[in-house]
C-alpha cells in the first residue's frame, strides 16, 4: 500500500492533473518510473507489472475555469427595440460599436447623449432630426406623440435664448 501515498480509494475515483478520471493503472507491486503516482508527462504512457497499457490522452480542458483577457469593454449584447423591450444585437452592430469613427446614425447619437448627459441605461438618441430652429413647441423630453427623445444638440438649442 505504500505505492498509493495518501491517495483515497483505488481506481476510478482518481483524476489526472486536468480533472479526467484515470483508470486503475497499478499492476502488482512494481510501477514504471514515475514515482508511483500514475501520471506522467503529456502523451506519456504508464505500464504496470500486470501488463496493462493505458495511454494518457492529450486533451486540453480548463476544468470549468473561464479564462478572460485583461481588456474590458462596455458593449452590451442587447439594445432597445423602440417598443419598450430589448432585442439582441447582431454581430454587425457589435463590430460597428467598437470601431472608432465608424459610428454613424443612431449609435453615434446614442453614445453622445449617454456620455454627455448621464442618461439612464438603454436611453436612445434620436436620429433624423435636421434643421435648426424649426421647433414644435414641445419643451418636455419627447417630440410630439412619436415617443422619441430629444438629441443632445436639441437640448442645447432649447437652452439658448431667442430660439423659442
From Swiss-Prot:
GO cellular component: cytosol
One Pfam family from the record: Dehydrin
The entry's keywords: Stress response
Keyword NAD assigned: no
InterPro entries from the UniProt entry: Dehydrin (IPR000167), Dehydrin_CS (IPR030513)
One GO term (biological process): response to water deprivation
Induction comment: By abscisic acid (ABA) and water stress.
Keyword NAD tagged: no
Bias type Low complexity, positions: 105-115
Region entry Disordered, spans: 42-164
Extent of Gly residues compositional bias: 42-51, 128-138
Biased composition (Basic and acidic residues): 147-164
Family classification: Belongs to the plant dehydrin family.
Protein name: Dehydrin Rab16C
Amino acid at each position: 500500500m505504500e505505492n498509493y501515498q495518501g491517495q483515497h480509494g483505488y481506481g476510478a475515483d482518481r483524476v489526472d492533473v486536468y480533472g479526467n478520471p484515470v483508470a486503475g493503472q497499478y499492476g502488482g507491486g512494481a510501477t514504471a518510473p514515475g514515482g508511483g503516482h500514475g501520471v506522467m508527462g503529456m502523451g506519456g504512457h504508464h505500464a504496470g507489472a500486470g501488463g496493462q497499457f493505458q495511454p494518457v490522452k492529450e486533451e486540453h480542458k480548463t476544468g470549468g475555469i473561464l479564462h478572460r483577457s485583461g481588456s474590458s469593454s462596455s458593449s452590451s449584447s442587447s439594445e432597445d427595440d423602440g417598443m419598450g423591450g430589448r432585442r439582441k444585437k447582431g454581430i454587425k452592430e457589435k463590430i460597428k460599436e467598437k470601431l472608432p469613427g465608424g459610428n454613424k446614425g443612431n449609435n453615434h447619437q446614442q453614445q453622445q447623449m449617454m456620455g454627455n448627459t448621464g442618461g439612464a441605461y438603454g436611453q436612445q438618441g434620436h436620429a433624423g432630426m435636421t434643421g435648426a430652429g424649426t421647433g414644435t413647441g414641445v419643451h418636455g423630453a419627447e417630440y410630439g406623440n412619436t415617443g422619441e427623445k430629444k438629441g443632445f444638440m436639441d437640448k442645447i438649442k432649447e437652452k439658448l435664448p431667442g430660439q423659442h
